[in-house]
């Protein structure tokens, strides 16, 4: 089949208009010839015989009359063994190899294979000759790090196939033919270990989509207890600049109870990506004891790279996540930041001269954001195993204004909202998730009634604090002042975590439940205080005791002695325990 060719008839920034004769489809890849180089671009609109393409490189040097060659392929990623531990740009070019070939500053027009053509993988066949197979069925497996990588029938092969031949166990490259299948018409199709899949099409080779109910344990107390995320769920982290969005995502990627983490750094500062690249190879995965980099894929399209590739980087990340979900693995995709992706959409929409929506974002922004988050989910595969993709996206609203279109469109589709507050980050309260503005629709690691009880003290404590700002401490009753101190204690010792401390950085569910029960006892106890000063000094001492308690390894002698000290300190001034707290503690036992 001859490839369609066209000519450039107009240039507007990184968008070019091309007149063509023949067949061109939306999202098809085209290459613009500039001298000896070919620049990759994607068809974003077709009107009659003129197509608009967004170029993924700087368009300097392109002129009217330049030749554009359409490939006939949609914008796709290559799927196969060897993805884990890689660092890609938004178009799935491996950056370490690019640096070797082109130096530290990216040259345009250089595109490399996403998977190594020389690395050999030990293939073990599972299917037998004569088997009837359909897309996503298992041909065999190869070990990839600590995972078993499934080699499957390509997802774009619809219909049924008969396995004609399959290679015996041995070492092969991703280009070697490992099997041959016959289609319903008798055509023989050779299969390798890798294949391509369009990034903007969701992978749907599963038997059933399930409701996310199992909590994704992040080992962050505030997230697991108060604002949980489910495996296969979605959540967003909006917050002003410098409030700790990226740091929170890094902590989640280190400690979350998932098999694979994919970080899509979309339009963020390069320094943050560099931090991940230097940190992850040195960090140990608590499950396997190997480096975190072995279970991580990083797609970085930093703010210094072309804007057009930002949109592609988000879709590349979610497609790789769906691919590993097909192997029955739990995948966490962290998109940082979806605001930059939305800005890339806005820029393209402006160039296409579409009618703008609010704040000049395209009118279809909501449906684009919804379509992206809908690709998350927990699924049951045809062999009965389960896999999940959990998506966490940060939003960077200008000035921390949560009323802007990207935040509002995201809030409509996500299952949990972790709103970061400038006030909390300035007060060095980490993580800076606002305990009253944030919410979650997913089940917590603790019983719902216990969580509600704790939140009621946070809310009432904040109300008393606001009242004290107006009438002063003198105009507040001692009962209200104690409620304020209890809310402040819960915030300081449970919601806040020290990520620089080895013990406090990652807190197991058992430890969270244990500490929370002690806090329920404190919250439900009425204390005998003569004055507010006595109450303040009592709770200050309790706070310091709890911080030492949090830094003691679970089950150690120091942990037990700190706990005994806390219980003794509570008994000194305790009067009685309210009925609701008694009931909650009985349930916990």
Swiss-Prot record:
Q: Which reaction does it catalyse?
A: ATP + H2O + 4 H(+)(in) = ADP + phosphate + 5 H(+)(out)
Any one Gene Ontology BP term: proton motive force-driven plasma membrane ATP synthesis
Official protein name in the record: V-type ATP synthase alpha chain
Whichever gene encodes this chain, its name is atpA
Q: Which is an annotated GO molecular function term of this record?
A: proton-transporting ATPase activity, rotational mechanism
Purpose: Produces ATP from ADP in the presence of a proton gradient across the membrane. The V-type alpha chain is a catalytic subunit.
Family in the record: Belongs to the ATPase alpha/beta chains family.
Q: Which PANTHER family is this protein grouped with?
A: H(+)-TRANSPORTING TWO-SECTOR ATPASE, V-TYPE PROTON ATPASE CATALYTIC SUBUNIT A
Keywords of this entry = ATP synthesis, ATP-binding, Hydrogen ion transport, Ion transport, Nucleotide-binding, Translocase, Transport
EC assignment: the record states: 7.1.2.2
The cross-references to HAMAP family, in alphabetical order and at most eight, read: ATP_synth_A_arch (MF_00309)
What domain of life does the UniProt record list for this protein's source?
A: Bacteria
Q: Which residues bind ATP?
A: 239-246
């Amino acid at each position: 089949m001859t490839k369609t060719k066209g000519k450039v008839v107009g240039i507007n920034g990184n968008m070019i208009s091309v007149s063509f004769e023949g067949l061109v489809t939306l999202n098809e890849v085209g290459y613009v010839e500039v001298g000896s180089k070919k620049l990759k671009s994607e068809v974003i609109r077709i009107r009659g015989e003129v197509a608009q393409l967004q170029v993924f490189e700087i368009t300097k040097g392109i002129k009217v009359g330049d030749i554009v060659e359409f490939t006939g392929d949609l914008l796709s990623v290559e799927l196969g063994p060897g993805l884990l531990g890689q660092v890609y740009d938004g178009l799935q070019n491996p950056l370490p190899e690019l640096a070797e070939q082109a130096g530290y500053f990216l040259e345009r027009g250089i595109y490399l294979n996403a998977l190594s053509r020389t690395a050999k993988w030990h293939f073990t066949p599972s299917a037998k000759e004569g088997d009837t197979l359909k897309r996503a069925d298992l041909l065999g497996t190869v070990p990839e790090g600590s995972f078993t990588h499934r080699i499957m029938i390509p997802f774009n092969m619809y219909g049924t196939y008969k396995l004609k031949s399959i290679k015996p166990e041995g070492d092969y490259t991703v280009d070697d033919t490992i099997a041959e299948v016959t289609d319903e018409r008798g055509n023989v199709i050779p299969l390798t270990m890798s294949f391509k899949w369009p990034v903007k099409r969701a992978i749907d080779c599963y038997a059933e989509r399930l409701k996310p109910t199992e909590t994704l344990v992040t080992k962050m107390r505030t997230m697991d207890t108060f604002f949980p995320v489910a495996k296969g769920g979605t959540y967003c982290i909006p917050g002003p600049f410098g409030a700790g969005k990226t740091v929170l995502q890094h902590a989640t990627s280190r400690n979350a109870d998932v098999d694979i983490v994919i970080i899509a750094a979309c339009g963020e500062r390069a320094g943050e990506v560099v931090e991940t690249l230097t940190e992850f190879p040195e960090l140990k995965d608590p499950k396997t004891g190997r480096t975190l980099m072995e279970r991580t894929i990083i797609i970085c399209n930093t703010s210094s790279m072309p804007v057009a590739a930002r949109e592609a980087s988000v879709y590349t990340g979610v497609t790789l996540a769906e691919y590993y979900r097909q192997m029955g693995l739990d995948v966490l995709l962290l998109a940082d930041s979806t605001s930059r992706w939305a800005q890339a959409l806005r820029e393209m929409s402006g160039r296409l001269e579409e009618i703008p929506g609010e704040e000049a974002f395209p009118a279809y922004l909501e449906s684009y954001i919804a379509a992206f988050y809908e690709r998350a989910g927990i699924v049951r595969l045809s062999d009965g195993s389960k896999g999940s993709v959990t998506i966490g996206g940060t939003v960077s609203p200008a000035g921390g204004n949560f009323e802007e279109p990207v935040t509002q469109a995201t809030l409509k589709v996500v299952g949990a909202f972790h709103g970061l507050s400038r006030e909390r980050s300035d007060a060095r309260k980490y993580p800076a998730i606002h305990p009253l503005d944030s919410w979650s629709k997913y089940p917590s690691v603790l019983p719902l009634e216990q969580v509600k009880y704790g939140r009621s003290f946070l809310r009432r404590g904040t109300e008393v604090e606001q009242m004290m700002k107006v009438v002063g401490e003198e105009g507040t009753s001692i009962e209200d002042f104690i409620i304020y101190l209890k809310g402040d204690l819960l915030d300081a010792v449970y919601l806040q975590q020290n990520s620089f401390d080895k013990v406090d950085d990652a807190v197991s569910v058992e430890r969270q439940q244990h500490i929370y029960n002690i806090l329920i006892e404190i919250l439900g106890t009425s204390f005998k205080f003569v004055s507010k000063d006595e109450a303040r000094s009592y709770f200050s001492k309790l706070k310091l005791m709890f911080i030492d308690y949090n830094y003691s390894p679970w089950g150690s002698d120091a942990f037990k002695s700190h706990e005994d000290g806390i219980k003794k300190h509570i008994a000194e001034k305790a009067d009685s325990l309210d009925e609701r707290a008694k009931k909650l503690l009985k349930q916990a036992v």
